[in-house]
Amino acid sequence: IMPSLVGSEMCIRDRDNPTVKSFINCSYIRGDFFEINRISAASMGACTDLIYLAARPYANGEVAFELPLNDATMTNVSHAGTFQGRNGVVKFEGTSLMNGGDGLLHSADGAFNKFSFGTYIYISEWVDGAFLFKKMDGNSTIIAFQMGATANSLKLSIGSSVATVTTPDLATGWHYIGLTYEQGTAKLYVDTNNTAISFVGALPNEVPNTRTDFLIGDKFKGYLDETFVSSLVVGTSGRNPITFDNWNNSKILAYWKYDDATKPGKDSHSWLGRLNNIRTALQGQQGDRRLRLGIAGGEWKKMMADATARTRFASEVKKIIEQYDFDGVDFDFEWPTNASEYNNYSATVIQMRSTLGKYVYFTASLHPVSFKISPEAIDALDFISYQCYGPAVMRFPYEQFVKDGEAAVAYGIPKNKLVMGVPFYGSTGSLIAAYCDFVNDGLATTNEDTYTYKGNTYTFNSIETIRKKARYVCEEDYAGIMSWDLATDIDITNNKSLLKVIKEEFEYYANPTE
Protein backbone atom coordinates (compact mmCIF):
# COMPACT_ATOMS: atom_id res chain seq x y z
CA ILE A 1 0.00 0.00 0.00
CA MET A 2 1.05 3.63 -0.46
CA PRO A 3 0.58 5.22 2.99
CA SER A 4 1.13 8.73 1.61
CA LEU A 5 -2.13 8.63 -0.34
CA VAL A 6 -4.35 10.55 2.04
CA GLY A 7 -6.48 13.57 1.23
CA SER A 8 -9.89 15.16 1.60
CA GLU A 9 -11.16 13.29 -1.46
CA MET A 10 -9.12 10.15 -0.90
CA CYS A 11 -10.94 6.96 0.01
CA ILE A 12 -8.17 4.42 0.52
CA ARG A 13 -8.11 1.66 3.11
CA ASP A 14 -4.84 1.32 4.99
CA ARG A 15 -4.40 -2.45 5.40
CA ASP A 16 -2.21 -1.79 8.49
CA ASN A 17 -4.78 0.56 10.05
CA PRO A 18 -8.26 -0.81 9.26
CA THR A 19 -10.00 1.67 11.58
CA VAL A 20 -9.49 4.49 9.06
CA LYS A 21 -12.99 5.43 7.85
CA SER A 22 -12.62 5.65 4.11
CA PHE A 23 -13.82 3.84 1.02
CA ILE A 24 -12.13 2.62 -2.14
CA ASN A 25 -13.66 3.87 -5.38
CA CYS A 26 -12.14 1.55 -7.98
CA SER A 27 -12.79 1.31 -11.71
CA TYR A 28 -11.26 0.06 -14.92
CA ILE A 29 -9.80 1.87 -17.93
CA ARG A 30 -9.92 0.09 -21.27
CA GLY A 31 -7.33 1.74 -23.47
CA ASP A 32 -9.31 1.75 -26.70
CA PHE A 33 -12.30 3.48 -25.07
CA PHE A 34 -10.03 6.02 -23.40
CA GLU A 35 -8.43 6.74 -26.74
CA ILE A 36 -11.74 7.53 -28.46
CA ASN A 37 -12.74 9.89 -25.64
CA ARG A 38 -15.29 7.66 -23.95
CA ILE A 39 -13.49 8.13 -20.60
CA SER A 40 -12.94 11.67 -19.35
CA ALA A 41 -10.26 13.01 -17.04
CA ALA A 42 -13.01 14.06 -14.63
CA SER A 43 -14.42 10.53 -14.41
CA MET A 44 -10.96 9.05 -13.85
CA GLY A 45 -10.24 11.76 -11.28
CA ALA A 46 -13.31 10.77 -9.26
CA CYS A 47 -11.78 7.35 -8.59
CA THR A 48 -9.21 6.56 -5.96
CA ASP A 49 -8.04 3.33 -7.57
CA LEU A 50 -7.70 3.04 -11.35
CA ILE A 51 -6.83 -0.14 -13.20
CA TYR A 52 -5.49 0.14 -16.74
CA LEU A 53 -6.32 -3.17 -18.41
CA ALA A 54 -3.46 -3.71 -20.82
CA ALA A 55 -1.70 -7.06 -20.40
CA ARG A 56 -2.15 -10.82 -20.45
CA PRO A 57 0.13 -13.79 -19.72
CA TYR A 58 1.57 -16.45 -21.97
CA ALA A 59 1.61 -20.03 -20.74
CA ASN A 60 5.32 -19.75 -19.92
CA GLY A 61 4.76 -16.73 -17.65
CA GLU A 62 5.87 -14.01 -20.03
CA VAL A 63 3.64 -10.94 -20.17
CA ALA A 64 2.24 -9.62 -23.44
CA PHE A 65 0.42 -6.35 -24.02
CA GLU A 66 -2.88 -6.03 -25.86
CA LEU A 67 -1.40 -3.16 -27.85
CA PRO A 68 2.29 -4.09 -28.07
CA LEU A 69 5.13 -1.60 -28.34
CA ASN A 70 6.61 -2.40 -31.76
CA ASP A 71 9.52 0.01 -32.06
CA ALA A 72 11.39 -1.37 -35.06
CA THR A 73 15.08 -2.12 -35.38
CA MET A 74 16.51 -0.93 -38.70
CA THR A 75 19.35 -2.68 -40.53
CA ASN A 76 20.77 -0.84 -43.55
CA VAL A 77 17.60 1.25 -43.73
CA SER A 78 18.11 4.97 -44.30
CA HIS A 79 15.81 7.87 -43.46
CA ALA A 80 14.92 10.52 -46.02
CA GLY A 81 13.43 13.83 -44.95
CA THR A 82 11.63 14.16 -48.27
CA PHE A 83 11.34 11.99 -51.36
CA GLN A 84 9.13 12.48 -54.41
CA GLY A 85 6.59 14.59 -52.58
CA ARG A 86 6.37 12.67 -49.31
CA ASN A 87 8.01 13.73 -46.05
CA GLY A 88 9.67 11.41 -43.55
CA VAL A 89 10.16 8.13 -45.42
CA VAL A 90 12.54 5.16 -45.20
CA LYS A 91 14.69 3.68 -47.97
CA PHE A 92 15.41 -0.02 -48.49
CA GLU A 93 18.42 -1.11 -50.55
CA GLY A 94 17.67 -4.78 -51.17
CA THR A 95 19.91 -5.77 -48.28
CA SER A 96 17.87 -3.78 -45.75
CA LEU A 97 15.60 -5.12 -43.04
CA MET A 98 13.11 -3.60 -40.61
CA ASN A 99 12.33 -5.77 -37.59
CA GLY A 100 9.03 -4.83 -35.92
CA GLY A 101 9.52 -7.29 -33.06
CA ASP A 102 7.57 -10.37 -32.04
CA GLY A 103 4.33 -8.74 -30.93
CA LEU A 104 2.33 -8.83 -34.18
CA LEU A 105 -0.15 -11.29 -35.74
CA HIS A 106 -0.16 -13.63 -32.80
CA SER A 107 -1.74 -13.38 -29.36
CA ALA A 108 -1.88 -15.03 -25.97
CA ASP A 109 -5.65 -15.01 -26.55
CA GLY A 110 -5.46 -17.10 -29.74
CA ALA A 111 -4.76 -16.98 -33.46
CA PHE A 112 -5.64 -14.07 -35.75
CA ASN A 113 -8.39 -14.79 -38.26
CA LYS A 114 -8.37 -11.26 -39.66
CA PHE A 115 -5.98 -8.35 -40.00
CA SER A 116 -4.94 -5.49 -42.29
CA PHE A 117 -1.56 -4.25 -43.47
CA GLY A 118 -1.20 -0.93 -45.23
CA THR A 119 1.62 1.27 -46.45
CA TYR A 120 2.66 3.83 -48.99
CA ILE A 121 5.21 2.27 -51.32
CA TYR A 122 7.64 3.54 -53.94
CA ILE A 123 9.28 0.73 -55.90
CA SER A 124 12.74 1.57 -57.22
CA GLU A 125 13.21 -1.86 -58.77
CA TRP A 126 10.81 -4.78 -59.01
CA VAL A 127 12.48 -7.74 -57.29
CA ASP A 128 10.88 -11.15 -57.59
CA GLY A 129 10.26 -12.50 -54.08
CA ALA A 130 10.94 -9.25 -52.23
CA PHE A 131 9.01 -9.17 -48.98
CA LEU A 132 6.73 -6.37 -47.90
CA PHE A 133 6.46 -8.31 -44.65
CA LYS A 134 7.04 -11.81 -43.37
CA LYS A 135 6.98 -13.97 -40.26
CA MET A 136 9.12 -17.08 -40.35
CA ASP A 137 9.63 -20.06 -38.07
CA GLY A 138 13.12 -21.07 -39.08
CA ASN A 139 12.81 -21.84 -42.79
CA SER A 140 9.04 -22.32 -42.59
CA THR A 141 6.68 -19.53 -43.61
CA ILE A 142 4.10 -18.44 -41.08
CA ILE A 143 2.86 -15.58 -43.24
CA ALA A 144 4.49 -13.56 -46.03
CA PHE A 145 3.40 -10.77 -48.38
CA GLN A 146 5.71 -10.61 -51.40
CA MET A 147 6.28 -9.28 -54.86
CA GLY A 148 5.61 -11.82 -57.59
CA ALA A 149 7.69 -12.97 -60.52
CA THR A 150 6.22 -10.37 -62.85
CA ALA A 151 5.69 -6.66 -62.29
CA ASN A 152 2.46 -5.76 -60.53
CA SER A 153 1.88 -9.28 -59.21
CA LEU A 154 1.77 -9.84 -55.46
CA LYS A 155 1.34 -12.98 -53.40
CA LEU A 156 0.23 -13.77 -49.86
CA SER A 157 1.46 -16.99 -48.27
CA ILE A 158 0.08 -18.45 -45.04
CA GLY A 159 1.89 -21.63 -44.16
CA SER A 160 2.15 -23.61 -47.39
CA SER A 161 -0.92 -21.95 -48.95
CA VAL A 162 -0.45 -19.19 -51.51
CA ALA A 163 -2.85 -16.67 -53.06
CA THR A 164 -1.97 -14.16 -55.76
CA VAL A 165 -3.29 -10.88 -57.11
CA THR A 166 -2.52 -8.69 -60.11
CA THR A 167 -2.51 -4.98 -59.36
CA PRO A 168 -2.69 -1.77 -61.34
CA ASP A 169 0.70 -0.30 -62.22
CA LEU A 170 2.84 0.02 -59.09
CA ALA A 171 6.15 0.43 -60.90
CA THR A 172 6.24 4.23 -61.00
CA GLY A 173 5.66 6.80 -58.28
CA TRP A 174 4.14 6.50 -54.83
CA HIS A 175 1.15 4.20 -54.31
CA TYR A 176 -0.97 3.25 -51.35
CA ILE A 177 -1.63 -0.48 -50.89
CA GLY A 178 -3.86 -1.99 -48.23
CA LEU A 179 -4.00 -5.75 -47.68
CA THR A 180 -6.94 -7.26 -45.79
CA TYR A 181 -7.39 -10.84 -44.66
CA GLU A 182 -10.44 -12.40 -43.04
CA GLN A 183 -10.98 -16.11 -42.51
CA GLY A 184 -9.18 -17.18 -45.64
CA THR A 185 -10.23 -14.30 -47.90
CA ALA A 186 -7.57 -11.79 -48.92
CA LYS A 187 -8.16 -8.50 -50.74
CA LEU A 188 -6.05 -5.57 -51.86
CA TYR A 189 -6.88 -1.87 -52.00
CA VAL A 190 -4.75 0.32 -54.26
CA ASP A 191 -4.52 4.11 -54.12
CA THR A 192 -7.94 5.79 -53.85
CA ASN A 193 -9.97 2.95 -55.37
CA ASN A 194 -12.60 1.81 -52.87
CA THR A 195 -13.18 -1.43 -54.78
CA ALA A 196 -10.86 -4.13 -53.52
CA ILE A 197 -9.10 -6.64 -55.77
CA SER A 198 -9.53 -10.22 -54.58
CA PHE A 199 -6.62 -12.61 -54.27
CA VAL A 200 -6.92 -15.91 -56.14
CA GLY A 201 -6.06 -19.07 -54.24
CA ALA A 202 -7.15 -20.93 -51.12
CA LEU A 203 -5.85 -19.71 -47.77
CA PRO A 204 -6.41 -21.10 -44.25
CA ASN A 205 -8.99 -19.52 -41.97
CA GLU A 206 -6.42 -18.15 -39.54
CA VAL A 207 -2.76 -17.22 -39.25
CA PRO A 208 -0.65 -19.78 -37.34
CA ASN A 209 -0.34 -18.42 -33.80
CA THR A 210 3.46 -18.50 -33.67
CA ARG A 211 5.43 -15.87 -31.81
CA THR A 212 8.19 -14.73 -34.16
CA ASP A 213 9.48 -11.41 -35.46
CA PHE A 214 7.50 -9.31 -37.94
CA LEU A 215 10.03 -8.44 -40.64
CA ILE A 216 9.53 -5.72 -43.25
CA GLY A 217 11.42 -5.04 -46.47
CA ASP A 218 13.66 -8.08 -46.91
CA LYS A 219 15.09 -7.93 -50.50
CA PHE A 220 12.92 -4.87 -51.22
CA LYS A 221 14.34 -1.96 -53.20
CA GLY A 222 12.40 1.24 -52.70
CA TYR A 223 10.77 3.45 -50.10
CA LEU A 224 8.00 3.06 -47.53
CA ASP A 225 5.88 5.58 -45.65
CA GLU A 226 2.99 5.44 -43.15
CA THR A 227 3.01 1.67 -42.52
CA PHE A 228 0.43 0.07 -40.23
CA VAL A 229 -0.93 -3.27 -39.01
CA SER A 230 -4.49 -3.58 -37.68
CA SER A 231 -6.51 -6.34 -36.03
CA LEU A 232 -9.54 -5.28 -38.11
CA VAL A 233 -10.39 -5.41 -41.80
CA VAL A 234 -9.65 -1.77 -42.61
CA GLY A 235 -7.66 -1.73 -45.82
CA THR A 236 -8.25 1.93 -46.61
CA SER A 237 -7.41 3.31 -43.16
CA GLY A 238 -3.88 4.36 -44.02
CA ARG A 239 -4.63 6.50 -47.05
CA ASN A 240 -4.56 9.59 -44.86
CA PRO A 241 -2.38 10.12 -41.80
CA ILE A 242 -3.91 8.04 -39.03
CA THR A 243 -5.44 9.69 -35.98
CA PHE A 244 -6.58 7.66 -33.00
CA ASP A 245 -9.99 9.18 -32.41
CA ASN A 246 -12.29 6.45 -33.76
CA TRP A 247 -12.98 2.81 -32.98
CA ASN A 248 -11.40 1.31 -36.10
CA ASN A 249 -8.15 3.19 -35.65
CA SER A 250 -8.01 2.25 -31.97
CA LYS A 251 -7.47 -1.34 -33.16
CA ILE A 252 -4.32 -0.52 -35.09
CA LEU A 253 -1.58 -2.70 -33.61
CA ALA A 254 1.43 -0.83 -35.00
CA TYR A 255 1.92 2.45 -36.86
CA TRP A 256 5.29 3.46 -38.23
CA LYS A 257 5.19 7.03 -39.54
CA TYR A 258 8.97 7.29 -40.09
CA ASP A 259 8.84 11.02 -39.30
CA ASP A 260 11.53 11.00 -36.59
CA ALA A 261 14.95 10.94 -38.25
CA THR A 262 16.60 9.99 -34.95
CA LYS A 263 14.21 7.07 -34.40
CA PRO A 264 12.59 6.19 -37.74
CA GLY A 265 11.31 2.84 -36.43
CA LYS A 266 9.24 4.40 -33.65
CA ASP A 267 5.82 2.82 -33.19
CA SER A 268 3.28 5.62 -32.79
CA HIS A 269 0.50 3.47 -31.33
CA SER A 270 1.13 1.36 -28.25
CA TRP A 271 -0.09 0.60 -24.74
CA LEU A 272 2.69 2.80 -23.41
CA GLY A 273 1.53 5.81 -25.42
CA ARG A 274 -1.95 5.31 -23.98
CA LEU A 275 -0.51 5.08 -20.47
CA ASN A 276 1.32 8.37 -20.94
CA ASN A 277 -1.87 10.00 -22.20
CA ILE A 278 -3.82 8.70 -19.20
CA ARG A 279 -1.23 10.17 -16.86
CA THR A 280 -1.33 13.49 -18.68
CA ALA A 281 -5.13 13.58 -18.35
CA LEU A 282 -4.91 12.90 -14.61
CA GLN A 283 -2.44 15.70 -13.92
CA GLY A 284 -5.18 18.28 -13.58
CA GLN A 285 -7.33 16.23 -11.21
CA GLN A 286 -7.51 16.95 -7.49
CA GLY A 287 -6.81 14.39 -4.81
CA ASP A 288 -4.64 11.29 -4.85
CA ARG A 289 -5.21 7.98 -6.51
CA ARG A 290 -3.47 4.81 -7.54
CA LEU A 291 -2.94 3.87 -11.18
CA ARG A 292 -2.32 0.15 -11.51
CA LEU A 293 -1.72 -2.41 -14.23
CA GLY A 294 -4.61 -4.75 -14.98
CA ILE A 295 -3.86 -8.23 -16.32
CA ALA A 296 -6.62 -10.34 -17.85
CA GLY A 297 -7.17 -13.18 -20.28
CA GLY A 298 -4.37 -14.85 -22.16
CA GLU A 299 -3.11 -18.30 -21.24
CA TRP A 300 -3.62 -17.72 -17.55
CA LYS A 301 -4.81 -21.21 -16.64
CA LYS A 302 -1.76 -22.82 -18.25
CA MET A 303 0.56 -20.29 -16.62
CA MET A 304 -0.94 -20.82 -13.17
CA ALA A 305 -0.67 -24.60 -13.49
CA ASP A 306 3.12 -24.45 -13.81
CA ALA A 307 5.28 -23.39 -10.84
CA THR A 308 8.15 -22.20 -13.05
CA ALA A 309 5.77 -20.12 -15.16
CA ARG A 310 4.17 -18.62 -12.03
CA THR A 311 7.57 -17.51 -10.78
CA ARG A 312 8.49 -16.01 -14.13
CA PHE A 313 5.13 -14.25 -14.36
CA ALA A 314 5.53 -12.67 -10.94
CA SER A 315 9.05 -11.54 -11.78
CA GLU A 316 7.96 -9.99 -15.09
CA VAL A 317 5.05 -8.17 -13.46
CA LYS A 318 7.37 -6.74 -10.84
CA LYS A 319 9.72 -5.47 -13.56
CA ILE A 320 6.85 -3.83 -15.44
CA ILE A 321 5.55 -2.14 -12.29
CA GLU A 322 9.00 -0.77 -11.51
CA GLN A 323 9.92 0.22 -15.07
CA TYR A 324 6.67 2.04 -15.80
CA ASP A 325 5.97 3.37 -12.31
CA PHE A 326 2.64 1.62 -11.70
CA ASP A 327 1.20 1.71 -8.19
CA GLY A 328 0.43 -1.99 -8.25
CA VAL A 329 -1.34 -4.73 -10.16
CA ASP A 330 -4.78 -6.32 -10.45
CA PHE A 331 -5.69 -9.84 -11.61
CA ASP A 332 -8.87 -10.07 -13.68
CA PHE A 333 -8.77 -13.73 -14.67
CA GLU A 334 -12.25 -15.13 -15.24
CA TRP A 335 -12.45 -17.55 -13.44
CA PRO A 336 -11.19 -20.63 -11.59
CA THR A 337 -13.89 -23.32 -11.71
CA ASN A 338 -12.54 -26.42 -9.96
CA ALA A 339 -10.32 -27.41 -7.05
CA SER A 340 -7.18 -27.65 -9.15
CA GLU A 341 -7.71 -24.21 -10.68
CA TYR A 342 -8.44 -22.67 -7.26
CA ASN A 343 -5.21 -24.18 -5.93
CA ASN A 344 -3.24 -22.85 -8.89
CA TYR A 345 -4.85 -19.42 -8.63
CA SER A 346 -4.07 -19.26 -4.92
CA ALA A 347 -0.48 -20.36 -5.52
CA THR A 348 -0.08 -17.62 -8.14
CA VAL A 349 -1.41 -14.97 -5.77
CA ILE A 350 0.96 -16.11 -3.02
CA GLN A 351 3.92 -16.17 -5.42
CA MET A 352 3.05 -12.70 -6.68
CA ARG A 353 2.90 -11.26 -3.17
CA SER A 354 6.19 -12.90 -2.26
CA THR A 355 7.83 -11.39 -5.34
CA LEU A 356 6.28 -7.93 -5.02
CA GLY A 357 6.82 -7.53 -1.29
CA LYS A 358 4.44 -5.96 1.20
CA TYR A 359 4.13 -2.42 -0.11
CA VAL A 360 3.08 -2.94 -3.74
CA TYR A 361 -0.70 -2.79 -4.00
CA PHE A 362 -2.04 -6.10 -5.27
CA THR A 363 -5.67 -7.12 -5.81
CA ALA A 364 -7.76 -9.70 -7.63
CA SER A 365 -11.23 -9.58 -9.15
CA LEU A 366 -13.44 -12.57 -8.34
CA HIS A 367 -17.12 -13.43 -8.77
CA PRO A 368 -19.90 -14.84 -6.56
CA VAL A 369 -19.72 -18.10 -8.53
CA SER A 370 -15.93 -18.22 -8.24
CA PHE A 371 -14.27 -16.73 -5.17
CA LYS A 372 -13.07 -19.55 -2.92
CA ILE A 373 -9.33 -19.04 -3.04
CA SER A 374 -7.24 -20.13 -0.06
CA PRO A 375 -7.04 -18.17 3.22
CA GLU A 376 -3.34 -17.58 2.52
CA ALA A 377 -4.18 -16.06 -0.87
CA ILE A 378 -6.86 -13.86 0.68
CA ASP A 379 -4.31 -12.63 3.20
CA ALA A 380 -1.81 -11.91 0.41
CA LEU A 381 -4.20 -9.54 -1.37
CA ASP A 382 -4.85 -5.93 -0.42
CA PHE A 383 -8.45 -6.41 -1.46
CA ILE A 384 -10.73 -8.54 -3.60
CA SER A 385 -13.03 -6.77 -6.02
CA TYR A 386 -16.18 -8.82 -6.12
CA GLN A 387 -18.11 -8.85 -9.40
CA CYS A 388 -21.67 -8.74 -8.07
CA TYR A 389 -23.18 -8.44 -11.54
CA GLY A 390 -23.65 -10.55 -14.65
CA PRO A 391 -23.46 -12.43 -16.72
CA ALA A 392 -26.80 -13.67 -15.38
CA VAL A 393 -29.52 -11.04 -14.94
CA MET A 394 -30.28 -12.38 -11.45
CA ARG A 395 -26.95 -10.91 -10.22
CA PHE A 396 -28.02 -7.28 -10.74
CA PRO A 397 -30.65 -6.58 -8.02
CA TYR A 398 -29.82 -5.01 -4.66
CA GLU A 399 -31.05 -8.05 -2.72
CA GLN A 400 -28.66 -10.37 -4.57
CA PHE A 401 -25.84 -7.87 -4.01
CA VAL A 402 -26.40 -8.19 -0.26
CA LYS A 403 -26.55 -11.99 -0.39
CA ASP A 404 -23.37 -12.23 -2.45
CA GLY A 405 -21.47 -10.04 -0.02
CA GLU A 406 -22.68 -12.03 2.95
CA ALA A 407 -21.62 -15.30 1.27
CA ALA A 408 -18.08 -14.01 0.71
CA VAL A 409 -17.80 -12.83 4.31
CA ALA A 410 -19.13 -16.15 5.59
CA TYR A 411 -16.44 -17.91 3.56
CA GLY A 412 -13.73 -15.89 5.28
CA ILE A 413 -13.06 -12.76 3.24
CA PRO A 414 -12.92 -9.85 5.72
CA LYS A 415 -15.20 -6.94 4.92
CA ASN A 416 -12.24 -4.57 4.95
CA LYS A 417 -10.81 -6.58 2.04
CA LEU A 418 -14.02 -6.84 0.05
CA VAL A 419 -14.67 -4.20 -2.61
CA MET A 420 -18.17 -4.79 -3.91
CA GLY A 421 -18.67 -4.65 -7.67
CA VAL A 422 -21.46 -2.76 -9.42
CA PRO A 423 -22.34 -2.65 -13.14
CA PHE A 424 -22.35 0.40 -15.36
CA TYR A 425 -24.05 -1.64 -18.07
CA GLY A 426 -27.20 -3.67 -18.62
CA SER A 427 -27.84 -7.24 -19.70
CA THR A 428 -30.63 -9.28 -21.25
CA GLY A 429 -28.86 -12.47 -20.21
CA SER A 430 -27.30 -12.81 -23.65
CA LEU A 431 -26.80 -9.22 -24.83
CA ILE A 432 -25.13 -6.34 -23.02
CA ALA A 433 -25.34 -2.59 -23.55
CA ALA A 434 -23.73 0.38 -21.86
CA TYR A 435 -25.63 2.50 -19.33
CA CYS A 436 -24.52 5.59 -21.26
CA ASP A 437 -26.32 4.22 -24.32
CA PHE A 438 -29.54 4.07 -22.30
CA VAL A 439 -29.10 7.66 -21.16
CA ASN A 440 -28.28 8.89 -24.65
CA ASP A 441 -31.30 6.96 -25.94
CA GLY A 442 -33.63 8.85 -23.61
CA LEU A 443 -33.63 7.07 -20.23
CA ALA A 444 -35.63 9.41 -18.01
CA THR A 445 -36.20 7.61 -14.72
CA THR A 446 -33.72 7.28 -11.87
CA ASN A 447 -35.31 4.34 -10.05
CA GLU A 448 -36.30 1.72 -12.63
CA ASP A 449 -33.87 -1.12 -13.27
CA THR A 450 -35.05 -2.20 -16.72
CA TYR A 451 -34.88 -0.36 -20.03
CA THR A 452 -35.87 -1.31 -23.56
CA TYR A 453 -33.09 -0.43 -25.96
CA LYS A 454 -33.16 -1.27 -29.67
CA GLY A 455 -36.02 -3.70 -29.13
CA ASN A 456 -34.47 -5.63 -26.24
CA THR A 457 -35.20 -5.23 -22.53
CA TYR A 458 -32.10 -4.89 -20.37
CA THR A 459 -31.70 -5.24 -16.62
CA PHE A 460 -29.28 -2.73 -15.13
CA ASN A 461 -28.70 -0.64 -12.00
CA SER A 462 -30.47 2.71 -11.90
CA ILE A 463 -29.17 5.74 -10.04
CA GLU A 464 -31.23 4.86 -6.99
CA THR A 465 -30.09 1.22 -6.97
CA ILE A 466 -26.45 2.30 -7.19
CA ARG A 467 -27.08 4.79 -4.37
CA LYS A 468 -28.66 2.07 -2.26
CA LYS A 469 -25.74 -0.28 -2.88
CA ALA A 470 -23.21 2.45 -2.05
CA ARG A 471 -24.98 3.23 1.21
CA TYR A 472 -25.08 -0.45 2.10
CA VAL A 473 -21.33 -0.73 1.51
CA CYS A 474 -20.68 2.25 3.76
CA GLU A 475 -23.07 1.27 6.54
CA GLU A 476 -21.92 -2.35 6.58
CA ASP A 477 -18.26 -1.30 6.53
CA TYR A 478 -17.17 -3.00 3.34
CA ALA A 479 -13.95 -1.68 1.81
CA GLY A 480 -15.53 0.12 -1.11
CA ILE A 481 -16.97 -0.27 -4.59
CA MET A 482 -15.53 -1.43 -7.89
CA SER A 483 -17.39 -0.47 -11.08
CA TRP A 484 -17.30 -1.97 -14.55
CA ASP A 485 -16.46 0.32 -16.12
CA LEU A 486 -15.71 3.99 -16.78
CA ALA A 487 -16.41 3.71 -20.52
CA THR A 488 -19.97 2.50 -20.00
CA ASP A 489 -21.09 5.19 -17.54
CA ILE A 490 -22.23 8.60 -18.68
CA ASP A 491 -19.61 11.24 -17.92
CA ILE A 492 -19.42 12.26 -14.27
CA THR A 493 -20.27 15.86 -15.20
CA ASN A 494 -23.74 14.56 -16.12
CA ASN A 495 -26.24 14.37 -13.25
CA LYS A 496 -27.22 10.88 -14.40
CA SER A 497 -23.72 9.52 -13.85
CA LEU A 498 -23.59 6.39 -11.68
CA LEU A 499 -20.01 7.12 -10.66
CA LYS A 500 -21.11 10.52 -9.39
CA VAL A 501 -23.60 8.84 -7.06
CA ILE A 502 -20.91 6.56 -5.62
CA LYS A 503 -18.56 9.49 -5.08
CA GLU A 504 -21.29 11.51 -3.34
CA GLU A 505 -22.17 8.68 -0.96
CA PHE A 506 -18.55 7.91 -0.14
CA GLU A 507 -17.79 11.54 0.60
CA TYR A 508 -20.80 11.79 2.89
CA TYR A 509 -20.01 8.64 4.87
CA ALA A 510 -16.31 9.51 5.15
CA ASN A 511 -17.22 13.00 6.41
CA PRO A 512 -20.75 12.69 7.82
CA THR A 513 -20.67 16.01 9.70
CA GLU A 514 -19.63 18.06 6.65
What are these regions (language model features)?
Residues 69-77, 86, 226-267, 498-500:
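Extended recognition patches within non-cytosolic domains
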Residues 198-223, 248-253:
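Flexible glycan-contacting loops in extracellular carbohydrate-active proteins
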Residues 71-96, 117-127, 142-205, 229:
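Extracellular glycan-interaction surfaces
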Residues 65-70, 117-118, 127-139, 191, ...:
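Aromatic-rich beta-strand patches that line glycan-recognition/binding surfaces
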Residues 1-14:
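Single conserved hydrophobic/aromatic residue that forms the stacking wall/gate
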Residues 46-47, 60-82, 264-267, 276-277, ...:
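Glycan-binding loop/region signatures in secreted carbohydrate-active enzymes
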Residues 91-115, 162-169, 241-247:
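Short surface loop/edge beta-strand patches of beta-sandwich-type extracellular domains
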Residues 13-85, 201, 265-400, 490-493, ...:
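Chitinase-like catalytic core of GlcNAc-active glycosidases
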